[in-house]
Amino acid sequence: MNNEKESLHDIQILDPELEIIDAHHHLWDLPGSRYLFDELLGDLNSGHRIEATVYVECSAMYRSQGPEELKVLGEAEFVAGMAAMSNSGRYGPTRICAAFVGAADLTLGNEVDAVLDGLATCSGQRLRGIRSSAIWDADPSVNTGTRPFAAKGILSSSSFRRGFERLAAKELSYDAWQYHPQIPEVISLAKAFPNTPIIINHVGGLLGIGPYAKSDLFQNWKTLIQEASEIPNIYIKLGGLAAKRCGFDYGTQPTETQLVHAWGPYIKTCIDLFGPERCLFQTNFPPDKVAGSYSKIWNVFKKIAVDYSPSEKKSLFNTTAKQLYKIK
C-alpha cells in the first residue's frame, strides 16, 4: 500500500485553463457517505476549470409515496434544486447539474412516456437521457457494488425495447451500464435503434476479478470495445475505473503515476478506437474518490491525454459531452 500523503497543497494542477465538462457524477446522502452540493462544490473549486457537470441517476432522493414507477421523479426534483442553487451565481461559475441522466423502468413499454415526461418537467427540462442497470454475470461474486443484478439479457427483452423505442421519440440518449462481457448486448441494442445515442459507461464496465482475473483480460476487453466502436451511435465514457471489480492492484492510496499506468491503456484504447468525438471524460464521483481527490483524478486524465492535440483534448474534455448532452 502506498502511504503518500495527499492534500490540495501537494497537487500541482495541470493545464488549469482547460475547460472541462464532468460528464458523469452523482450526489447522495447515504449512511457514511454524504456527497451533496457543498461536497461537490469543494471539489469543483480544487483547481481545475469545470465549466459544467452532468448528473447521472443513482437512486437518490426518490419519492417515498405515490406510484412505484413515478418515485424516480424525486431524483429529478432534487437535481432541479441543486441546479437552481448553482444558477443563482452565488457559488461560482460552474453550472452544476446542467444536464440530467435520469432513471426509468423501460420495461414499462409505451407506458414509460409518463415517467419520461415527468422526469423532464420535474428536472426543469434538464433531462437529456436515461440510464438503467443491465449488470449481470453468472458469477454473483463479481458484483462488488450496491445494486443487485438486473434480469439476465434485459437489453434484449421485448418489453425493454418497447420502452427504449420511446427515447428516440423524446430525443433522449441512453447511458449503458453493464459489465464488459455484456458489450455484445449493447451492440445489438445500438444496431436495433440507430437513431438513439448510446453512451457506454465506465470504459465498458471492466471486470477484472473472479473468473475474469486472467492475463488475457485486456485483449478480451479490447476485442469487444473494438466491435462497439464500429457502431456509429455508440459513445464511451472514460473513467469509472476505481471500482474493486476492475481488479487493479495499486493499493488503497495510488499515486498519479500508478493510476496513469493502470488506467492509461484502457482509456487510450477507447480514444484511439472511437475517436475523441465519441469519447468523454467522467469523474464518477463520489464512487471513484477511493482512488484519490477530484483534482488528482483530473490530473491523471490530463496526463493520459497529454499526447493528443489541443482540438482532440477539447473534444475529450468538453465538446463531446456538451453536444451529446445538449449543454448550452
Q: Where in this protein do the model-derived segments appear?
A:
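Histidine-centered catalytic micro-motifs
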Residues: 19-30, 200-203
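Conserved, mostly hydrophobic/aromatic
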Residues: 24, 53, 79, 100, ...
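Catalytic pocket-lining loop regions of alpha/beta-barrel enzymes
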Residues: 150-280, 291, 309
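Short, acidic/polar
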Residues: 37-44, 76, 109-119, 220, ...
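Mid-to-C-terminal alpha-helical segments outside catalytic/metal-binding sites
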Residues: 1-19, 23, 35-43, 51-52, ...
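Alpha-helical scaffold segments that flank or form the walls of functional sites
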Residues: 30-95
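Active-site gating/metal-coordination segments in enzymes
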Residues: 2-5, 67-182, 188-191, 204, ...
